């Protein structure tokens, strides 16, 4: 299945453009560019993404349900309307103890913070 961008210039309701699929994690690209991407996801109860790291910060926003985000072994419970920024280079897991839908936004700056 091809993961194409959401149609431009057309109104949509984010929570309605993705459905739950039993025993699955479903992802749909809203917009994807070389400088970053916005993705909407649905996680069925009991599903999770394996632990990973990203070279960029990730803005994660729950639009329906409740998500568990584990960042460097610290668990965060997010409910509808809540958000968290997953820091770049941090080990993290996204888990569905109950099903949820979310939006993830990654902006690829190409630069790490530099302290002087």
Regions found by a protein language model. Name each.
Residues 63-64, 79-80, 98:
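A cytosolic small-molecule/anion-sensing beta-strand core signal
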Residues 88-112:
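Ligand-binding loop in jelly-roll beta-barrel domains
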Residues 56-68, 72:
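Glycine- and acidic-residue-biased ligand/ion/polar-headgroup-sensing regions
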Residues 37, 66-68, 75, 91, ...:
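Structural motif
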Residues 1-35:
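A short, N-terminal "cap"/entry segment at the start of jelly-roll beta-barrel domains
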Residues 73-88:
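Short acidic-glycine-tyrosine-enriched beta hairpin
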Residues 24, 39-54:
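Conserved short histidine dyad/triad with adjacent acidic residue
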